[in-house]
Amino acid sequence: NGTDMSELNTNNRYNEYTYDFYVGFSKNMGEHLSFSASITGEYYKTARYHAWAAYPTTELTYVMTPAHILQLSFTSDKTYPSYWDLSKSTGYISGYEEVQGNPMLKPSTDYSANLNYILKNKYIFSLAYDYQPDLFQQLAYQSTERLALIYKTLNWDYQQSFSATTIIPFKIGHWLDSHVTLQAEYRQAKCNKFFDLSFNHSKWIGLAMLQNNIILSTKPDIRMELTGLYLSPSIQGNYDLNHIWAIHTGIRWNFANQKASIQVKANDLFNSMEGNIDVTLRNKGQYMDMHTNNYSRNITLSFTYKFGGYKEKQHKPIDTSRFK
């Protein structure tokens, strides 16, 4: 007798239709106030799901004086699940771990409201609220029916966050130009139908980042970029994640009357951003500790030469995100 392999078939046909329209306008009301608004309407249809949706966007700018500017904005957008996540098939990582597709996934929406205060065209103070109904992400579930760890992408009820951000630039002489970014965020993720469970997970998260542009020499023209960041312990759905940190750096030499340059860049120099992540799950009988170790360090060497007044044409890249 042979083994039934029907569930291993990854051949799928998926039909998807979208119809949309766009309307927008902008208006200057005197010297101090400007306003713009737009709305995109969309009809989205698959074999298992169809819906009308509207995605409005507004922005209001009030210039009290050149040194004091207020900006209030509201944006909305959508994210579609990848075609792989929409597959009916099941893939097996090991005898214990498996990845299940979910053809019932629907798009998620992102609503964002931001209030920015810009002081002296340098200092930025921001308050933001972000609400994402039907957010989808892949999470792990320990089956209560068999010995299996199931990875599956599901739509949650929502994820929301409140954040306050401060950006402070400063200079030291003519050789150092720096920016400090500080952010405090409250994040909440809620899902009432996560297999046979539910979760309502929240946490305060802090981010600190320092970006430096350093002139090492003017003759020859040698410049350095150095960025460091720290993210406090955070959450992803019902997961708890440990803190992460990273250092990015690069050196550029400009010569031949600024027409030529050689640049060396190193991102995540110590492989600390994705190379050492601890995932903890403690939710209604679900108990898991997982350590991931990805290699995220990369070093690039590039040479650039500008011929005359040549300017590179900007080409819109093809969106391949849903094929990953």
Predicted regions located by residue number:
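Surface-exposed extracellular loop regions of Gram-negative outer-membrane beta-barrel proteins
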Residues: 13-61, 175-186, 207-233
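Residues that define the transmembrane beta-barrel architecture of outer-membrane proteins
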Residues: 13-19, 50-54, 107-113, 119, ...
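Residues on the lipid-exposed face of transmembrane beta-strands in outer-membrane beta-barrel proteins
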Residues: 19-27, 58-62, 113-119, 164-170, ...
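Repeated loop/turn-to-beta-strand initiation elements of outer-membrane beta-barrel proteins
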Residues: 31-35, 67-70, 121-127, 174-179, ...
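Transmembrane beta-strands of outer-membrane beta-barrel pores
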Residues: 39-47, 74-80, 90, 121, ...
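Outer-membrane beta-barrel signature, preferentially recognizing the C-terminal barrel domain
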Residues: 78-127, 131-133, 149-163, 171, ...
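C-terminal beta-barrel architecture of Gram-negative outer-membrane proteins
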Residues: 208-254, 267-279, 283-287
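C-terminal beta-signal and adjacent terminal beta-strands/loops
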Residues: 255-324
